[in-house]
From Swiss-Prot:
Protein name per its UniProtKB record: Leucine--tRNA ligase
Gene transcribed to yield this protein: leuS
Motif ('HIGH' region): 66-77
Annotated ATP binding sites: 725
Broad class of where this protein is predominantly found: cytoplasm
InterPro entries the record matches: aa-tRNA-synth_I_CS, Leu-tRNA-ligase, Leu_tRNA-synth_edit, M/V/L/I-tRNA-synth_anticd-bd, Methionyl/Leucyl_tRNA_Synth, Rossmann-like_a/b/a_fold, tRNAsynth_Ia_anticodon-bd, Val/Leu/Ile-tRNA-synth_edit
PROSITE patterns referenced in this protein's UniProt entry, alphabetically: AA_TRNA_LIGASE_I (PS00178)
Gene3D superfamilies reported for this sequence: HUPs (3.40.50.620), Isoleucyl-tRNA Synthetase, Domain 1 (1.10.730.10)
Domain of life of the organism encoding this protein: Bacteria
Keywords in alphabetical order: Aminoacyl-tRNA synthetase, ATP-binding, Cytoplasm, Ligase, Nucleotide-binding, Protein biosynthesis
Motif 'KMSKS' region location, chain numbering: 722-726
One cellular-component annotation, GO: cytosol
Length: 952
């Protein structure tokens, strides 16, 4: 083992920023040179060379990895990274084998946009940003196993992203078994007739191309002509999650239009029930669980068939008991039957003008209406604002009473939820009521209890006006019974069926970009998709000069995507042998979305250099497999602690769970879930400043005068906001490390408040953390001579009480990620020692302190540990334990109240009886002064807390 101070000049004796920087650099080199934080695997190239068995007790702690775009980190970014490092270091001291590393999520739109702005290739920009971020993170002293670090842009990594894509592509979801199965197991079921094709055709009677299509209809990855979010300004399609509520791109703020395109989709909806139900297995916050449940949006109800001009229009409703109140129908403007029904539509002659949107015919009205909503996002369409729509010129038949009801299209109905059509019950639905009121449509009460003249009645009540002559009468029934009876009648008459619907939609899995994982898919001359064999992976991005996306006029809704990879003709047009001789193929020119690499990266951390597998299952089982003996019988397995922001609750986390479940179904992993425990850290906030236009100005250039703030002479407004580039209030960690030291930054960020809450940054307060470390240093090192100030001496009882209570509290706080209170307890203990031992100090009092400090301030702890005669790192020193006998007081002090006011204090034995406590209170001189000559009415003892005497 190398020693970081061997061969160096004597250190300065005072703990200054200069000394801190020197110590920190030396110990960081020591950790790197000695592989201090390297965690061994059971098998493979990271297994112990001597064959030594691994500890059964392990910990896999993981951060949500960063996006290496822009100008690097600000002090808000390391908050979670420092916290996980503290937790990992503490657990190493408990004897656990700890896996902690950090990679880079380097593909995707942010990196590409930044590269476009700077005029350099995304790879060049990304690698430079990664190196800068590595430097910044390295300066913080994070205890990462650098051998396990990955970047999603490394071909060695995305080879396996492509491989996992192919596993999903070559799978189908067996609804009966509720799991993914290989496509090879599907074909025999289609051939035998045990499973039907999606369109009901006889599989064996189909030609080869039709058979392939029948199989493709079952795949978990498929191409679909679907309505997507097309952003001409970015030149790509966006997922719903990447579109803001006002219908603009989250990145770049460009208009987004709804457009029908053929796109790769992942059938995440097949896993809706498991994604909801398995949340109960996870140690996640209820907030995140609720967000995922709401995003998936499971609703129980019925599908009901309405007849319209010879066509069947199926609606989904959670309230089939209100069918008698359905007075009109609404289809989403994109519904596939709209154009079919338009061909059968009548004229607008005699039609209410409010229904026509000022147009002469249904066809013209529909075209104009569709154009008017093209730029609206789903969220914008569902906002509570004035309802709009147009009459389709046809009528539908209400199946329960035979009423002819008008059929409209309106933007508040979406194709992605339910069936894209609704039965409108305005008396008992607020949106339907608003629509009916605006357009003058009938409103019929079918649930008693409200006043439909004033508003929709949406609460529960008995059914009224709800009977027909065909065997259905639910009048007088409560909601649940009425629903059940209506569904039973619908199924008996073959007019509907009970069912479950979800808000969740299949995952749009393609982008028209350059900087992403290429698809391992080629197309033959007939346009049929073929998966590439494993031997042809990775499909690497071609080197191209023109990597910029083909962007369009941001307002050009009629533009068509043109992926930049399509320009690389030599790469696109290939001749391959896929098992039946060489043939010409065309590569897919889309790339995967930014979420692909982050959907599985924790598994590559486990086995980062395995060339044969994405992750050896023996290594996966050790690090993430279920441990029912530790975590309970229903433990799903997964990473032991995953720390990151709550903003990823329904994006990354949902996608990662989906991919992991497919891998579990196919037998590639032993864990059912990717992340056993999730912890959402808060944010570091800082003052931000806006000028009279509301534009943010650089916080560093703002001056304060007489309580007001000025930028270039103009008064500006001060506000708090999340630290970042957009608010121009970022503080670089480099500056804090240079001016105070990394340990000071670590202590300050951990002491600012509970980890799961946001906290304000104030550079002027950092000095408080520095002073704490200086006091710690002075306990051990004489600032004048550099001599060590410890001596061999038995601790006093008071010393032992302070030490063991500190150990007990700190252990509990570290275990529960209450690092801010760890710092508070350590400060209290240092203050006690400083006051008690102004000259020299017993080694037995300070050695445990250094170990307790080391997870938070590892560099100074290592240096002091070495000064006290140790040759090895403090990293694996067993964490101090406490003795119970020092946690309880022999004597306690109790306040004594007389008629509710404290009049004295007494000291009694901790186990004193109530009678002994009263006797001591009455004997106290100050208390006697208050009760002398008065009658003692009542005496109350609150054990361990206080004594109250009532006199008169």
């Amino acid at each position: 083992m190398t020693n970081p101070s061997e061969g160096t000049t004597p250190l300065a004796f005072r703990y200054t920023p200069e000394l801190a920087n020197k110590i920190e650099g030396e110990w960081q080199n020591y950790w790197t040179d000695n592989g201090t934080f390297n965690a061994p695997n059971p098998v493979g190239d990271l297994a112990p060379a001597d064959g030594k068995a691994l500890p059964e007790d392990k910990l896999f702690v993981q951060d949500m990895f960063p996006y290496p775009s822009g100008a690097g980190l600000h002090v808000g970014h390391p908050l979670g990274y420092i916290a996980t490092d503290v937790f990992a270091r503490y657990n190493r001291m408990l004897g656990k084998n700890v896996l902690h590393t950090l990679g880079y999520d380097a593909f995707g739109l942010p990196a590409e946009q930044y590269a476009i702005q700077t005029g350099t290739h995304p790879r060049t920009t990304t690698m430079a940003n990664i190196e800068n971020m590595k430097r910044q993170l390295g300066a913080l002293g994070l205890g990462h196993d650098s051998r396990r670090a990955v970047a999603t842009t490394d071909p060695e990594f995305y080879k396996w992203t492509q491989w996992i894509f192919l596993q999903i592509f070559n799978s189908w979801f067996d609804a009966e078994q509720q799991k993914a199965r290989p496509i090879s197991e599907l074909i025999p079921l289609l051939e035998s007739g045990e499973l039907k094709t999606k369109d009901g055709a006889d599989y064996n009677a189909l030609g080869d191309v039709e058979k392939q299509k029948a199989v493709d209809d079952y795949r978990l990855v498929y191409r679909s002509n679907s309505t997507v979010n097309w952003c001409p300004g970015l030149g790509t399609v966006l997922a719903n999650e990447e579109v803001t509520a006002d219908g603009r791109s989250e990145r770049g703020n460009f208009p987004v239009f709804r457009k029908n395109l053929s796109q790769w989709m992942m059938r995440i909806t097949a896993y809706s029930d498991r994604l909801i139900d398995d949340l109960e297995l996870l140690d996640w916050t209820e907030k995140v669980k609720s967000m995922q449940r709401n995003w998936i949006g499971r609703s129980r109800g019925a599908e009901v068939d309405f007849s319209a001009e010879g066509e069947t229009v199926t609606v989904f409703t959670t309230r089939p008991d209100t069918l008698f109140g359905a007075t009109y129908m609404v289809l989403a403007p994109e519904h596939e039957l709209v154009d079919v029904l338009l061909e059968k539509a009548g004229s607008y002659e005699g039609v209410d003008a409010r229904w026509t949107n000022g147009q002469a015919s249904p066809a013209e009205a529909v075209a104009a209406y569709r154009a008017s909503i093209a730029a609206k996002s789903d969220l914008e369409r569902q906002e509570n604002k004035e309802k709009t729509g147009v009459f389709l010129g046809v009528y539908a038949t209400n199946p329960v009473n035979g009423d002819q009801i008008t059929v409209f299209i309106a933007d508040y109905v979406l194709t992605g939820y339910g069936t894209g059509a609704i039965m409108a019950v305005p008396a008992h639905d607020e949106r339907d009521y608003e629509f009916a009121t605006v357009l003058g449509l009938p409103i019929k009460e079918v649930v008693a209890g409200g006043n439909i003249e004033e508003a929709a009645f949406t609460e529960s009540g008995e059914a009224v006006n709800s009977a027909n002559d065909n065997g259905l009468d639910i009048n007088g029934l409560a909601k649940d019974e009425a629903i059940a009876k209506t569904i039973e009648w619908l199924e008996e008459k073959e007019l509907g069926r009970g069912t479950i619907q979800y808000k969740l939609r299949d995952w749009l899995f393609a982008r028209q970009r350059y900087w992403g994982e290429p698809f391992p898919i080629v197309y033959d001359e007939n346009g049929q998709a073929h998966a590439l064999p494993d031997s042809m992976l990775p499909v690497e991005l071609p080197e191209v000069e023109d990597y910029k996306p083909v962007s369009f006029d941001p307002e050009d809704a009629d533009s068509e995507p043109s992926p930049p990879l399509a320009k690389a003709r030599e790469w696109v047009e290939v001749e391959l042998d896929l098992g039946d001789g060489k043939k010409k193929y065309t590569r897919d020119t889309n790339v995967m979305p930014q979420w692909a690499g982050s959907s599985w990266y924790q598994l590559r951390y486990v086995d980062p250099s395995n060339d044969e597998q994405f992750c050896n299952i023996e290594n996966e089982r050790y690090w993430t497999g279920p441990r029912p003996e530790t975590h309970g019988p229903n433990d799903p397995g997964g990473v032991d602690l995953y720390v990151g922001g709550v903003e990823h609750a329904v994006l990354h986390l949902l996608y990662a769970r989906f991919w992991h479940k497919v891998l579990f179904d196919l037998g590639h992993v032993s864990s059912k879930e990717p992340y056993r425990r999730l912890y959402n850290q808060g944010y570091i906030q800082a003052f931000a400043y806006t000028d009279s236009r509301g534009v943010y100005v650089p916080a560093d250039d703002v001056e304060e005068k007489d309580g007001k703030f000025f930028y270039q002479g103009e008064e500006v407004n001060q506000e708090y906001g999340k630290m970042g580039k957009s608010l121009k209030n970022a503080v670089a960690p480099d500056d804090i490390c240079n001016n105070f030291g990394a340990d000071t930054l670590r202590v300050y960020e951990m002491a600012m408040g509970p980890l799961d809450t946001s906290r304000p940054w104030a550079t002027k307060d950092v000095v408080g953390a520095q002073r704490f470390l200086q006091r710690l240093w002075r306990l051990v090192v004489d600032e004048n001579t550099g001599e060590v100030l410890t001596r061999d001496e038995v601790l006093t009882d008071d010393d032992n009480k302070q030490l063991h209570r500190t150990i007990a509290g700190v252990r509990d706080d570290y275990t529960n990620l209450r690092v801010n209170t760890v710092v508070a307890k350590l400060i209290e203990y240092v203050n006690y020692l400083t006051k008690t031992y102004p000259d020299t100090i017993p080694a037995g009092a300070v050695l445990p302190l250094i170990v307790m400090v080391s997870p938070i301030a590892p560099h100074i702890a290592e240096e002091l540990w070495k000064k006290l005669g140790h040759d090895d790192t403090v990293t694996y020193e067993p964490f101090p334990t406490f003795e119970e006998k020092w946690l309880t007081d022999d004597e306690i002090e109790l306040p004594v109240q007389v008629n509710g006011k404290v009049r004295g204090r007494i000291t009694v034995a901790a186990d004193a009886s109530q009678e002994q406590v009263i006797e001591a209170a009455l004997a106290d001189e100050k208390v006697q002064e208050q009760i002398s000559g008065k009658n003692l009415i009542k005496q109350i003892v609150v054990p361990g807390r206080m004594v109250n005497l009532v006199v008169k």
